[in-house]
C-alpha cells in the first residue's frame, strides 16, 4: 500500500464537509437588521414621597409624574409621557449624466512618378494609399428614487436629555388575518416644536428612525427561497 492510496480516502471526508458547509452557508437565512433597537416603550418610575415640613408652600418637591401645572400647557416633559408623531416623509432624488465623443481622421499617400523598373508592381495607381478612420462614443445614465411615508404613531418619552429635549420611542402592531405589521419609531424631539394638540411632524424630529416591517405568509412570499439563495451564493457570475 502506497502513501497516495492512504491520503485519498482521508481527503474525501474533508471535501464532503467543505461542500456541506458551502451548501449550508448558501441556504442560510439573511436576517433583517432592525433600524429601531432597544425597548419600544418606557414606564415612569415610582415617585418618592417627601414628608411635609408644616409650610403651605413646599420649597422642594419630588418629581411627581401625575402633576400638571395650572398655568402651563400639558406638554410631555417626563419619562412615560405620550406624544403623537405625524409621519410626513417624502424624499425624492434624481440624477442624470451623459457624455459624447467623436473623432474623425483621414490620410492619403501617393507617388506621382514611378520608376521604370517599378512600373510593373506599382503601376496603374498601385502606389496610392488612402485611409479613413471614424470613432464615435455616446453614453447616458440616470437614476430616480421616490419614497413616501405618511401616517401617525403615538410614542412615549424614554429619556429626558440634559438640554430638555425628549428621546421618544414607540411601536405599533397591526394584525391582519395571518400577518402582522410593525411600525417602529425613535428620535429626539424638541419640546418647542410640539403643537397644542400634543403632536409633532416627523420632519422636525432629530435622529429619526422609522421602520415598517411585517411577518406572515405575505412577507415570506417576498423572500428568496433557500435553493435560490444556494445557487446565488455558489454562482461565480
Curated annotation (Swiss-Prot):
Membrane topology: Lipid-anchor
Localization of this protein: Cell outer membrane; Bacterial flagellum basal body
Domain of life: Bacteria
Native species: Pectobacterium atrosepticum (strain SCRI 1043 / ATCC BAA-672) (Erwinia carotovora subsp. atroseptica)
Any GO molecular function: cytoskeletal motor activity
GO CC field: bacterial-type flagellum basal body, distal rod, L ring; cell outer membrane
Keyword field contains Signal: yes
Biological process annotations from GO: bacterial-type flagellum-dependent cell motility
Lipidation (N-palmitoyl cysteine): 27
Similarity annotation: Belongs to the FlgH family.
Lipidation residue positions, type S-diacylglycerol cysteine: 27
Functional summary from the UniProt entry: Assembles around the rod to form the L-ring and probably protects the motor/basal body from shearing forces during rotation.
Protein name: Flagellar L-ring protein
Chief subcellular location: membrane
Subunit (UniProt): The basal body constitutes a major portion of the flagellar organelle and consists of four rings (L,P,S, and M) mounted on a central rod.
Leader sequence segment: 1-26
Keywords: Bacterial flagellum, Cell outer membrane, Lipoprotein, Membrane, Palmitate, Signal
Amino acid at each position: 500500500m502506497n502513501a497516495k492510496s492512504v491520503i485519498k480516502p482521508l481527503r474525501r471526508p474533508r471535501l464532503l464537509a467543505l461542500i456541506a458547509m458551502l451548501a449550508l452557508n448558501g441556504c442560510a437565512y439573511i436576517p433583517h437588521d432592525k433600524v429601531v433597537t432597544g425597548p419600544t416603550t418606557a414606564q415612569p418610575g415610582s415617585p418618592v414621597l417627601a414628608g411635609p415640613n408644616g409650610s403651605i408652600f413646599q420649597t422642594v418637591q419630588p418629581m411627581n409624574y401625575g402633576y400638571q401645572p395650572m398655568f402651563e400647557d400639558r406638554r410631555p416633559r417626563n419619562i412615560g409621557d405620550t406624544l403623537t408623531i405625524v409621519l410626513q416623509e417624502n424624499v425624492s432624488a434624481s440624477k442624470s449624466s451623459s457624455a459624447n465623443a467623436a473623432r474623425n481622421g483621414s490620410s492619403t499617400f501617393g507617388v506621382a512618378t514611378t520608376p521604370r523598373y517599378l512600373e510593373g508592381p506599382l503601376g496603374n495607381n498601385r502606389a496610392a494609399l488612402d485611409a479613413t478612420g471614424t470613432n464615435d462614443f455616446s453614453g447616458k445614465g440616470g437614476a430616480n428614487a421616490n419614497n413616501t411615508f405618511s401616517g401617525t404613531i403615538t410614542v412615549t418619552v424614554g429619556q429626558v436629555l440634559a438640554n430638555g429635549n425628549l428621546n421618544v420611542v414607540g411601536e405599533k402592531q397591526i394584525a391582519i388575518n395571518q400577518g402582522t405589521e410593525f411600525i417602529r419609531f425613535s428620535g429626539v424631539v424638541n419640546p418647542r416644536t410640539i403643537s397644542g394638540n400634543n403632536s409633532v411632524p416627523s420632519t422636525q424630529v432629530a435622529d429619526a428612525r422609522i421602520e415598517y416591517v411585517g411577518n406572515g405568509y405575505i412577507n415570506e412570499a417576498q423572500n428568496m427561497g433557500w435553493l435560490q439563495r444556494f445557487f446565488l451564493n455558489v454562482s461565480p457570475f
